[in-house]
Amino acid sequence: MICNIKRRPAGGIKVGTLAVGEIVQIAVSGVMTNFIVANQGIPEDTGTGYDGSYDTSCDGTWMIAEALMDGPKIYSLQTWSYDITSWFSAMIDEKTLNAIRQATYPYYSSSGADTTTTKVTRPSVRELNYLWKYKGSTYDGAPLKYFLTHSAIMPWTGSSSEADYWTRSKSPSDPFENAIYIGDSGTAQQSDDSSNARARPLFIFEPDTRVKKVSDGIYQLA
């Protein structure tokens, strides 16, 4: 006798089908935390000077934290994206970590356009839709679609630095000593590691990752 075995379809929908601006909640230190779908696929520049340094590893669902976190400070401007991966991965479960792509992100170094390969990073100035130009016509990436229509400014709540957060972009004038952060006024500013600016994690989900709807515009991993 021949038995036809049908596989049950996987629950939920693919995160790669969500609209930019929708929310995926993941547990961070046991607390459901909102992450915004910031882009689907490889970001496309809407200006001039993009150095084209995204590769296929970035062809997924870009997620950015809705709120700031007290993450690690910039330390002597070494490879801080590795530090934020270690810090962030310690707060999430294995299922979530496995859904995040190892991706190659562009950034500006002392020698010019460069890349860093990591799972969790900080947004670049250009990804937040700022036009901070480096040598020649090089930008560190391209705008994420969410920030074409939404501000990168975080709400000011009273503390002079509570709404400030680091980018992964280094200073064009002094990349050895200064990095760029987004201030509560909305300006991109540079500072050394003495700044109390916070972290806004950015990562890319595998587009086939399944999510389930919990309310309008809000999803969780299935």
Model-derived segments and spans:
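Collagenous Gly-X-Y triple-helix signature in extracellular proteins
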Residues: 1-222
